């Protein structure tokens, strides 16, 4: 009898399956918190692999960008066509503190505004806020009929388009330079800038559907934990002067 490996004996029994491990047992959930500039601060939840060895869960979470509908953050369906991007900057226990990272329109809203018999005017500026955030802001506007107009269309001449684009760029630059990122976010939500553009351009050509359709973050300053805590309503001036609990007073021996 030849001495060798018996292939039949080395095989496992038929029907046995490998033990399936649920991948979610190695993950943990974190709550995403929006800045205090929004009405609803509870954005949702996200998961990440648990900390093991040299791999820390907080390192995998920092820098993560989530996209949320502005209607969910404000509790109003009037903002359902705008999407807000929030970036995770700090991990505090099971809470993820985020900051504004950008804004955009939904595709269906942009497509619905483009119609016949009117002129589309677009403008964009790259400008720095007062707290050193570099943003690129895109604005969009459409012409409308003048009062008592008989013509069917409301096309604007090239000179009108250039003049309107110049006014829009000047207003956007001024508003961004004189505001912090949090203040600018507060202006974008109620569309304060849009009304200012409409009033400034009514003598050139009447406009409608004026929107800041996109805000893109190009560069951000060095991370400041104190500024982020203030943005989330923590570490404010009301708490100044309070005694910090959890520490014992150290008694020094007299010399």
From Swiss-Prot:
Q: Where in the cell is it found?
A: Cytoplasm
Which Gene Ontology molecular-function terms are recorded?
A: structural constituent of ribosome
Q: Which UniProt keywords apply?
A: Acetylation, Cytoplasm, Isopeptide bond, Phosphoprotein, Ribonucleoprotein, Ribosomal protein, Ubl conjugation
* UniProt crosslink position (Glycyl lysine isopeptide (Lys-Gly) (interchain with G-Cter in ubiquitin)): 248
Q: According to its UniProt record, which protein family does this protein belong to?
A: Belongs to the eukaryotic ribosomal protein eS1 family.
HAMAP family for the chain: Ribosomal_eS1_euk (MF_03122)
**By what name is this protein known?**
Small ribosomal subunit protein eS1B
Q: What species was this sequence derived from?
A: Saccharomyces cerevisiae (strain JAY291) (Baker's yeast)
Its taxonomic placement starts with:
Eukaryota, Fungi, Dikarya, Ascomycota, Saccharomycotina
């Amino acid at each position: 009898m030849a001495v060798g490996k018996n292939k039949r004996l080395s095989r496992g029994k038929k029907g046995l399956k490998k033990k399936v491990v649920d991948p979610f047992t190695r993950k943990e959930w974190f709550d995403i918190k929006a800045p205090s500039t929004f009405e609803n601060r509870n954005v949702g939840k996200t998961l990440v692999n648990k900390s093991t060895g040299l791999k820390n869960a907080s390192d995998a979470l920092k820098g993560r960008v989530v996209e949320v509908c502005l209607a969910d953050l404000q509790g109003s369906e009037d903002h359902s066509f705008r999407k807000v991007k929030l970036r995770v900057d700090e991990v505090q226990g099971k809470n993820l503190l985020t900051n504004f990272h950008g804004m955009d329109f939904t595709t269906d809203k942009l497509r619905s505004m483009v119609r016949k018999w009117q002129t589309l005017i677009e403008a964009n500026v790259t400008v720095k806020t007062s707290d050193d955030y570099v943003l690129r802001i895109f604005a969009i506007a459409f012409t409308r009929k003048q009062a008592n107009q008989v013509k069917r269309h409301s096309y604007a001449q090239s000179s009108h388009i250039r003049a309107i684009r110049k006014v829009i760029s000047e207003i956007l630059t001024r508003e961004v330079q004189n505001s912090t990122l949090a203040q600018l976010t507060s202006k974008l939500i109620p569309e304060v800038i849009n009304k200012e553009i409409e009033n400034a351009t009514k003598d050139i050509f009447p406009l409608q559907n004026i929107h800041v359709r996109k805000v893109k973050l190009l560069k951000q300053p060095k991370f400041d934990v104190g500024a982020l805590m203030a943005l989330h309503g923590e570490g404010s001036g009301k708490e100044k002067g309070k005694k910090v609990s959890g520490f014992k007073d150290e008694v020094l021996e007299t010399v």
